Amino acid sequence: MALDNKFVAKGLRLYSARSVANRTKTFVAKKNKVVAPKKVVAPVTPVEKTFGKGKRVIAAKASKFAPSIPAEIRSTAAKKVQQKVALRKSITPGTVLIILAGRFAGKRVVALKQLDSGLILITGPFKVNGVPLRRIDQRYVIATSTKIDVSSVKVAATINDAYFAAEKKSTTKSEGAFFSDEKKAEKKKIADSRVADQKSVDSAILAVLKKEKFLTVYLKTKFYLKKGEFPHQLKF
């Protein structure tokens, strides 16, 4: 008969683990544990049966029950399928966007294209308002009615999601660095290839901006709401 070891308080039972073991004598059963011999499974040979005029080899019969050993269960790992993100109809290549959050909140930028991850590739240009080539989610931008002709802008195929992937930092530290009191913040050096990519994209956009009179000033001006203005009442 099982021992009724009920709770007397939250997380506290009437008998301790030692008391339960002494009362039920579970240690005796563990000491005198009988190990059952392993069953030797006989190899299954295919059986040949006659059906009418012909003969057929019957394969091994499938097991009636599911395997109890985890190694025998076939793993069904889910395949990661990246679904295509639908872009808003108001966002097209060349659309001027207003960034709503982050480091460049309020800046006006130019949308270049949609990447495979669904994020939008944007640029300031950097020479105009200091916004470099970046990725941004469409939920953090407002699409304006202003559009720039970016048909002459050629974005390299290398500028993709892997282009913006962050480098993995090493977690191991030397003994001197671990015990040092002063921590010098090293300035991250931008690769020459990234600088060249930024210049090639910006030069094509700046050539288009020269043709329009107020576009450069428009992109330089930061967006903000004045007193009495509400974003849902504005036409962008």
From Swiss-Prot:
Keywords: Ribonucleoprotein, Ribosomal protein. It comes from the Eukaryota. Pfam families: Ribosomal_L6e (PF01159). Disulfide bonds: none annotated. The keyword Transmembrane does not apply. The keyword Chloroplast does not apply. GO terms for cellular component: cytosolic large ribosomal subunit; extracellular matrix. GO terms for biological process: cytoplasmic translation. GO terms for molecular function: RNA binding; structural constituent of ribosome. Gene3D superfamilies: 2.30.30.30. InterPro entries: 60S_ribosomal_eL6 (IPR000915), Rib_uL2_dom2 (IPR014722), Ribosomal_eL6_CS (IPR049633), Ribosomal_eL6_KOW (IPR041997), Translation_prot_SH3-like_sf (IPR008991). Belongs to the eukaryotic ribosomal protein eL6 family. This is Large ribosomal subunit protein eL6. The lineage of its organism: Eukaryota, Amoebozoa, Evosea, Eumycetozoa, Dictyostelia.
